[in-house]
Amino acid sequence: MKTLLLVATSLLSTQAFAADTLTVYTYSSFTAKWGPGPKIKQAFEKECGCNLNLVALEDGVAILNRLRLEGKHSKADLVLGLDDALLSEAKQSGLFAPHTTKLDGIKVPGGWQDDTFVPYDYGYFAFIYNKDKLKAPPKSLKELVERPDLKVIYQDPRTSTPGQGLMLWMKSIYGEQAPAAWTELAKKTVTVTKGWSEAYGMFLDGEADMVLSYTSSPAYHLIAENKPQYQAAAFEEGHYRQVEVAAKLKSAKQGKLADQFLQFMISPAFQQEIPAGNWMYPVTDAPLPKGFEQMITVSKPLSFTSDEVAANRKNWIREWLQAVTQ
């Protein structure tokens, strides 16, 4: 009997002092050992006295697709990795709860006011190339589409936020002529990948001249690898802007921890890991490492509202799919 009482007491004590676990759905490059995830996990766990479980999925659009499938039964408390183009669709899903985050100090191009989604970084889409291999990069998106000598890789707009970003970029420039542009681009497309990591890895392996990424991506090669040959091609039509966001789920089992994480997300401890971890721009005054000043400057930011994207995304994806499968 004494033994049973001791075991029971031990179990109760373990349960009483077991740390709570916050489960976050995000994308694979965020959780990678070279990404910001490991350091952010360590810093937040120290602050909250909890466990942070970062679940790596393919990419932003795929994360929203999974949440729709799981519904209120999702194991996630919070999602990190959607972007501003998906806001209206995400809200229409009814899966997300309002945040309690104080947004003072957030500095996002175009401003930010939203009661559900909190931004944590931003950037601009660009095609990356190796200047030692590609001596004359295209100076516009139209030149990239029309040049017969280029091989490119990009991501699927049905699963990837960069892939969706290219679709919006193409639409913002070509308008009703976008299907013809997609057909032309398909002639020089090596492959379309589900997510960013796969596409970028193939580019680094020499399988294409250019890959869809961000204007800030060369900072990684310059700062972490001392390889200045990787560059972002500056396009005269402008570059499409992306703001990445996080939000709490209505079904969150750890709602208070989710609120705490969202506030932590715009603190120096989180934001300082963004430039040299996620290789994007922070949404606060967090300092940029030396080397970022060499990144191209975007003078013509392009964007649609999330309502415009929600109203047209299915049709625009259908346009893309029909064009690339001809």
Model feature map: region roles:
Residues T21, Y25-G37, E58-A62, K75-A208:
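Extracytoplasmic ligand-binding site segments that recognize negatively charged/polar headgroups
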Residues P38-L54:
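Short alpha-helix C-terminal cap/hinge motif
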Residues A85-E89, L204, A208-Q229, N278:
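A ligand-binding cleft/hinge motif common to bilobed small-molecule-binding domains
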Residues A97-L103, D115-P119, K142, L222-Y240, ...:
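Short beta-strand->loop
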Residues V108-P109, G123, W182-A186, V192-T193, ...:
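Periplasmic-binding protein-like
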Residues A126-K133, K171, Q242-Q254, E273:
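A bilobed periplasmic-binding-protein/Venus flytrap-type ligand-binding module shared by bacterial periplasmic
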Residues L249-F304:
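Mature extracytoplasmic/periplasmic domains
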Residues G291-Q326:
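Extracellular/periplasmic bilobal clamshell ligand-binding domains
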